[in-house]
């Protein structure tokens, strides 16, 4: 018999989030005047808790800020849905069991909200308060919970229903009738609508015929499985369709035209189209991982090297539909699914770094709605508009989807949170806002684009899956099944608004990244075995759940399979067979394992605490059988699925698209009378051009230690990088580059041009990285369109043809991977008026290439004049691949002036791009380029401004050479008789030159090398379109000159604040507004010197060298708990310093496989132990403190005279909670939520204090940049420690070297800038920043140039690890 209890916990909302929620609730009922929230913990135990056990549980569940006294009001208890076990509960229960509480059956968490109304005069006299009526309660409740995973109950006692086991729902059959085909078809049509299957008429006929031949009725399981496996999302029916356009049969499908690129340029591609990700050729790399069989005396594997041919994975996915419905989980699971695709390639691989992109409709920011954010018809010529006309208001949106602003507040956090917790850096991406009324059709992205992509690495020997002998075990690895994401594949294939609201919401998955981390650790352990890898084949579980993944796994090997439904790992009771088999619960993989290898695989899973289950086995007969072990063997319910594989995955009817092209007459962009001052600022404020900082600092960009170029550039950390770059390993400088290109608004005017420009932009972006040749470039193409809307199908076909049959073949590059999402329109009814928003054909290109030397990557940071008043010593040159056409159609200028245009930028000649790429590579190799930035959204104006922002300087631009008559343009960069060559109106030509978004780039070169640069450009045929346009200035002004007159001048600070405005506003709606204001105001500091390192020691000195020379290598335990993700780079740094590094999981200590006594020291690594359940690092610490064996072992270790330990980030949080058993740590604080209430990923500066720490010996007084990546780094002395007595090792300092609490220089608000503390004897030190991620200079997004050349290229932080080795003697 279970025994239930409820333990109240900490505050669930910070003060500013409480105030924000109150503002929302006041819009429901203005009389609501207070809201509070407190965590509740519901505990189910197998036996009554003793007083000691209850006290232990209370201590376990004490974390965060104490709750205030209860207040009166309406109570709302939000808890997980009955019958489910939440991810939080799984981790908390596991922690409890590790804390010597075996009788705990389960711990669940809820939140009790108390909503209080005003007393009012009469109620004030009687002492009473207004109670909410039922309608208001329902409206309030809707804002307090996620109805997919949570419910609202009225009392705490009702929460005990969480532990009820619900009865399983029955299998259903669809009766097709005995002989009446029409009746059978009608029954299937009804099921199609009821279940949201999205089956076409042809598919319904196919299924009726197939089941008549099988002589039985289909089950709901089979229908749901078929619908997911054959959805547009999974089978890409439109891309494989036959086409007729304007009555003319087309000879190729869309997919055939994409494949054409690979057929013509297969070189360098290892895997294309046949797996979860594409694979391009890499190179020899030093792979670094724990080696099985090296356990020796320690019982755990030692880290080591293996030189191996290592290839690069490429994958880019979209998750548009879920993000429209529920932005945080939609984007989170989009990122998670793409990561799984990489890990499930071949026979197992390792994800490495990510990209993220968003496209939405107008944001309509509160108190900052822009003049162009309305429904004015842009097809009306500007000259015909009456200035007094009032523009129609915004088009609105359906209730069932999130607003664009909500998507951009919640979606990026969802995607970043998954990447952060899983442990993959996100290094690049894009953000576009587009919405315009064009001739009565609203074009935009109410159904957003949410794109997640990335790269990974795979051993050359693991790139292809193996065959599956009959009897091969079919295993589910990872998270449990729950009723989540039902019908997601089918739902995402429908236009938003054509499904029911409940089915739309059902189709959104929810994420648990810590679980996926555990599963990935198992995959890593498998591929690390090389030829002994037990994985024969692997697939990720995505659309359709295991009902799609398991059949794909066996179909690829020409096998059938038999599964037992009751062996599927679940954490929800009451599921029907269809819900068990078809749900899209995340963090799952399906694997094929040979029976003989299973014991070893099982041991790996148990060590990582990764759930797994053997669900079935492969069969020779190609029949798919799913049996229900709970049903009698002779009952019809015993076989929820029993069908030939070729019925499920064979050849359902091939789609035929019969479409037509639709011509449209649009006016050209009219710039007559436009005010340059206004337009310049409006363009910078447009979200597409504006700073993306709010999307970037929320993400971890350094985990793994292999990144060298992220979005942030220079000592002022401005987000303007063109390309993301990683290294292949921790030793060399070869690596990979990736970037994105997209120009979707152009498709409204000329869809094929938009496709060509997307590829062109990807090339001009990636050109910033040193790449041997353009032929090494590989592209991913993600295609979006509103198929079915008149003219859009033909536009899609023409765009794919332009890319796949023309441009890519001409460039000699291929597209080995991609995805499509072809239901990009939103329909709804607004008070009887039918409305819709139709997205343009949208090609998002991601480009990938091997990099020869990551140190040569170019950035947009301008190098300023040598000193104030001196003549400019550098020159800016624009390379204009538009050859002076200055086409404005679809540009940001057109959008902010509410125009569309009829002529767009285009790639006129593929040879231009090839010559451009070759010229930039040659100039870079010769060391002639100081800065580089491609021209894109916002045109030359935005390009130059961003370069100045990154350089923290002014710039003077002369547009004379850009306003010439194109027929008389010089082939050299100097003006010659320009006054005689000018034609047309000068002001108009200036606007076109500044704001046209033609392909090209601006380069900064030493003035002394200008002639040599032009010689190279002339060699590549580019001199005629290359022009000297100016230079940095010392005035801090951004100036535009024409005809020897200054036509525009504004302070860089003013323009940079305009450019940052959108980011600041969105961050202020999401994070602590005091912090976001502080960051915004930092732009006012004109004299800010930027990051300013100062070293008090010799960077080239290796203090560990004499001790390494003895040959002694002390053992260092690289300690991790489930969810930790920074152990690999830490192990490398320790190994480089002269230690033997061993991989020690807490499960190893619990199982007795090893003991801390076997090691000289340990490092507790960063990440998200237990997903930060029970507080960051606290769950990890409590499994030690409340477990007698572990507490004794750790206490003994700390009390040894020769031991040392380091805690970093999550390890710092954990060790701070161990302070009671660490000698000399009594004054240590806890580390709690950042003052910004946000995860902070930044490069900041710390000062090394004089302290006893052995890790900082000889570094005192140094100011050194270091990365932070945490959400809970605030040194909190309110519950523990003594700020007056604590020994501080590091403090955050500002760019002038002063200790600071100013955000974001102090990223968490810690008092007195505390970033690290140590014990009185200095042997045990903890710090929140990550030195292990920047032990090489090249790992920093910015560092002084001389650091990379010093010694072995180590950064100053390598001294920490070498100090530890020196301490060991």
UniProtKB/Swiss-Prot annotation:
Region of interest (Disordered), residue spans: 321-352, 373-400
| InterPro entries, per the entry | Class_I_gatase-like, FGAR-AT_N, FGAR-AT_PurM_N-like, PurL_large, PurL_linker, PurM-like_C_dom, PurM-like_C_sf, PurM-like_N_sf
Question: EC number(s)?
Answer: 6.3.5.3
Residue positions annotated to bind Mg(2+) are 722, 761, 765, 934
The GO cellular component terms are: cytoplasm
Q: Which GO terms describe its biological process?
A: 'de novo' IMP biosynthetic process
Compartments, as annotated in UniProt = Cytoplasm
Residues annotated as domain Glutamine amidotransferase type-1? 1116-1369
Per the Swiss-Prot or TrEMBL record, the active site comprises 1209, 1330, 1332
The keyword Ligase is annotated on this UniProt entry: yes
Q: List the pathway annotation.
A: Purine metabolism; IMP biosynthesis via de novo pathway; 5-amino-1-(5-phospho-D-ribosyl)imidazole from N(2)-formyl-N(1)-(5-phospho-D-ribosyl)glycinamide: step 1/2
| Family annotation (PROSITE patterns) | GATASE_TYPE_1 (PS51273)
For whether the record's keyword set contains Magnesium, the answer is: yes
Function of the molecule: Phosphoribosylformylglycinamidine synthase involved in the purines biosynthetic pathway. Catalyzes the ATP-dependent conversion of formylglycinamide ribonucleotide (FGAR) and glutamine to yield formylglycinamidine ribonucleotide (FGAM) and glutamate.
Q: Which family does it belong to?
A: In the N-terminal section; belongs to the FGAMS family.
Spell out the protein name for this chain.
Phosphoribosylformylglycinamidine synthase
Native source organism of the sequence: Ralstonia nicotianae (strain ATCC BAA-1114 / GMI1000) (Ralstonia solanacearum)
């Amino acid at each position: 018999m279970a025994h239930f209890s409820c333990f109240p916990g900490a505050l669930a909302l910070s003060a500013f989030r409480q105030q924000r929620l109150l503002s929302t609730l006041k819009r429901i009922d203005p009389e609501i005047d207070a809201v509070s929230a407190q965590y509740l913990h519901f505990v189910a135990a197998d036996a009554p808790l003793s007083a000691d056990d209850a006290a232990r549980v209370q201590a376990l569940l004490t974390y965060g800020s104490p709750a205030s006294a209860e207040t009166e009001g309406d109570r709302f208890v939000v808890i997980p849905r009955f019958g489910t076990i939440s991810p939080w509960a799984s981790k908390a229960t596991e922690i409890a069991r590790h804390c010597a509480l075996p009788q705990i059956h389960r711990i669940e968490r809820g939140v009790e909200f108390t909503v209080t109304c005003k007393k009012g005069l009469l109620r004030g006299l009687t002492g009473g308060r207004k109670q909410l009526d039922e309608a208001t309660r329902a409206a309030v409740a809707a804002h307090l919970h996620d109805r997919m995973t949570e419910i609202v109950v009225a009392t705490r006692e009702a929460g005990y229903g969480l532990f009820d086991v619900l009865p399983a729902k029955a299998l259903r059959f669809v009766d097709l009738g005995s002989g009446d085909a029409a009746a059978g078809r009608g029954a299937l049509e009804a099921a199609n609508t009821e279940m949201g299957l999205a089956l076409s008429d042809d598919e319904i006929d196919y299924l009726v015929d197939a089941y008549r031949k099988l002589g039985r009725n289909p089950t709901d399981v089979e229908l749901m499985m078929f619908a997911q496996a054959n959805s547009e999302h999974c089978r890409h029916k439109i891309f494989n369709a036959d086409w007729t356009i304007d009555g003319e049969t087309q000879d190729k499908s869309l997919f055939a035209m994409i494949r054409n690129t690979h057929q013509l340029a297969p070189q360098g591609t290892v895997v294309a189209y046949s797996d979860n990700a594409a694979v391009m050729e890499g190179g020899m790399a030093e792979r670094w991982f724990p080696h099985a069989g090296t356990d020796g005396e320690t019982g755990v594997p030692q880290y080591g090297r293996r030189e191996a041919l290592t290839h690069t994975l490429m994958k880019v996915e979209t998750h548009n539909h879920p993000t429209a419905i529920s932005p945080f989980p939609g984007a989170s699971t989009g990122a998670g699914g793409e990561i799984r695709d990489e890990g499930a390639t071949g026979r197992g691989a390792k994800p490495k770094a990510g990209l993220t992109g968003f496209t939405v409709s107008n944001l309509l920011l509160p108190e900052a709605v822009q003049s162009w954010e309305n429904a004015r018809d842009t097809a009306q010529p500007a000259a015909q508009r009456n200035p007094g006309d009032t523009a129609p208001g915004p088009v609105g949106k359906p209730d069932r989807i999130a607003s664009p602003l909500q998507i951009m507040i919640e979606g990026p956090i969802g995607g970043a949170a998954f990447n952060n917790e899983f442990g993959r850096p996100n290094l690049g991406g894009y953000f576009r806002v587009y919405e315009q009324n064009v001739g009565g059709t609203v074009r935009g992205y109410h159904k957003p684009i949410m794109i997640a992509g990335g790269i990974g690495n795979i051993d050359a020997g693991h790139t292809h899956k193996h065959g599956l002998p009959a009897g091969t075990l079919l295993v589910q690895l990872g998270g449990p099944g729950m009723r989540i994401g039902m019908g997601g594949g089918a739902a995402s294939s429908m236009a938003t608004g054509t499904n029911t609201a409940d089915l739309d919401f059902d189709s959104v998955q929810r994420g648990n990244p810590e679980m996926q981390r555990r599963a990935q650790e198992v995959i890593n352990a498998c591929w690390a075995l090389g030829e002994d890898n037990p994985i024969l084949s692997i697939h990720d579980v995505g659309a359709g759940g295991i009902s799609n993944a398991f059949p794909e796994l066996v179909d690829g090997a020409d096998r059938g399979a038999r599964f037992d439904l009751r062996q599927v790992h679940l954490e929800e009771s009451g599921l029907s067979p269809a819900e068990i088999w078809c749900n899209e619960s995340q963090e799952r993989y399906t694997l094929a394992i040979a029976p003989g290898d299973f014991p070893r695989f099982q041991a790996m899973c148990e060590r990582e605490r990764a759930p797994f289950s053997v669900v079935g086995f492969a069969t020779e007969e190609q029949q798919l059988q799913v049996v229900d072990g709970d049903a009698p063997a002779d009952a019809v319910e015993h076989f929820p699925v029993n069908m030939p594989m070729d019925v499920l995955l064979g050849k359902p009817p091939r789609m035929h698209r019969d479409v037509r092209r639709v011509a449209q007459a649009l006016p050209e962009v009219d710039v007559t009378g436009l005010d340059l001052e206004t337009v310049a600022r409006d363009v910078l404020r447009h979200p597409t051009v504006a700073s993306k900082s709010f999307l970037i600092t929320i993400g971890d960009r350094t985990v793994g230690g292999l990144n060298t170029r992220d979005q942030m550039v220079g000592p002022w950390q401005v987000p303007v990088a063109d390309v993301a770059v990683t290294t292949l390993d921790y030793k060399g400088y070869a690596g990979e580059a990736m970037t994105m290109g997209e120009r979707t608004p152009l498709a409204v005017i000329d869809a094929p041009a938009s496709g060509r420009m997307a590829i062109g932009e990807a090339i001009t972006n990636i050109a910033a990285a040193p790449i041997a040749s353009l032929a090494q470039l590989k592209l991913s193409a993600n295609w979006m369109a509103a198929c079915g809307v008149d003219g859009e199908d033909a536009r899609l076909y023409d765009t794919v043809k332009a890319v796949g049959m023309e441009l890519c073949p001409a460039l000699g590059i291929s597209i080995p991977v991609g995805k499509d999402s072809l239901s990009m329109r939103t329909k709804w009814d607004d008070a009887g008026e039918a409305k819709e928003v139709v997205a343009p054909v949208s090609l998002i290109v991601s480009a990938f290439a091997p990099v020869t030397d990551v140190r040569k990557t170019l950035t947009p940071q301008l190098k300023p004049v040598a000193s104030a008043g001196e003549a400019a010593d550098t020159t800016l040159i624009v390379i204009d691949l538009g050859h002076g056409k200055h086409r404005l159609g679809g540009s940001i200028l057109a959008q902010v002036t509410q125009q569309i245009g009829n002529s767009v930028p285009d790639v006129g000649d593929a040879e231009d791009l090839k010559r451009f790429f070759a010229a930039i590579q040659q100039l870079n190799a010769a060391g002639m380029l100081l800065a580089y930035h491609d021209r894109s959204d916002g045109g030359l104006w935005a390009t130059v401004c961003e370069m100045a922002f990154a350089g923290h300087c002014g710039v003077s631009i002369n547009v004379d050479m850009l306003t010439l008559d194109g027929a008389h343009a010089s082939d050299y960069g100097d003006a010659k008789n320009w006054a005689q060559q000018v034609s047309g109106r000068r002001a108009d030509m200036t606007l076109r030159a500044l704001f046209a978004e033609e392909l090209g780039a601006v380069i900064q070169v030493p003035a002394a090398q200008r002639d040599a640069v032009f010689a190279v450009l002339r060699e590549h045929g580019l001199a005629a379109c290359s022009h000297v346009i100016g230079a940095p200035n010392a005035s801090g002004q951004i100036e535009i000159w024409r005809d020897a007159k200054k036509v525009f001048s504004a302070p860089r600070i003013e323009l940079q604040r305009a450019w940052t405005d959108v980011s600041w506003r969105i961050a202020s709606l999401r994070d602590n507004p005091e912090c976001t204001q502080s960051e915004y105001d930092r732009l006012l500091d004109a004299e800010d010197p930027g990051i300013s390192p100062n070293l008090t020691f010799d960077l080239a000195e290796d203090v560990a060298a004499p001790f390494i020379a003895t040959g002694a290598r002390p053992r260092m335990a690289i300690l991790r708990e489930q969810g930790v993700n920074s152990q690999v780079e830490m192990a490398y740094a320790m190994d480089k310093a002269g230690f033997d590094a061993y991989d020690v999981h807490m499960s190893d200590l619990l199982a007795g496989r090893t003991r801390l006594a076997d090691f000289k020291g340990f490092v507790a690594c960063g990440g998200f132990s237990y997903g930060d359940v029970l507080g960051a690092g606290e769950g990890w610490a409590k499994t030690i403190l409340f477990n007698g064996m572990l507490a004794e072992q750790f206490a003994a270790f700390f009390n040894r005279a020769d031991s040392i330990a380091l805690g970093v980030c999550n390890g710092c949080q954990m060790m701070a909670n161990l302070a009671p058993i660490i000698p000399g740590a009594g004054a240590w604080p806890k580390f709690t939520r950042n003052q910004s209430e946000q995860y902070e990923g930044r490069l900041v500066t710390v000062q090394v204090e004089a302290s006893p720490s052995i890790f900082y010996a000889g570094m005192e007084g140094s100011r050194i940049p270091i990365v932070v990546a945490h959400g809970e780094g605030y040194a909190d002395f309110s519950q523990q420690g003594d700020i007056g007595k604590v020994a501080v090792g590091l403090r955050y300092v500002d760019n002038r070297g002063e200790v600071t609490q100013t955000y974001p220089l102090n990223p968490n608000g810690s008092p007195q800038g505390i970033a690290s503390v140590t014990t009185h004897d200095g042997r045990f030190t903890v710090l929140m920043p990550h030195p292990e991620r920047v032990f090489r200079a090249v790992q920093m997004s910015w560092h002084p140039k001389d650091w990379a050349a010093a010694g072995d290229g180590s950064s100053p932080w390598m001294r920490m690890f070498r100090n530890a080795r020196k301490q060991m003697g």
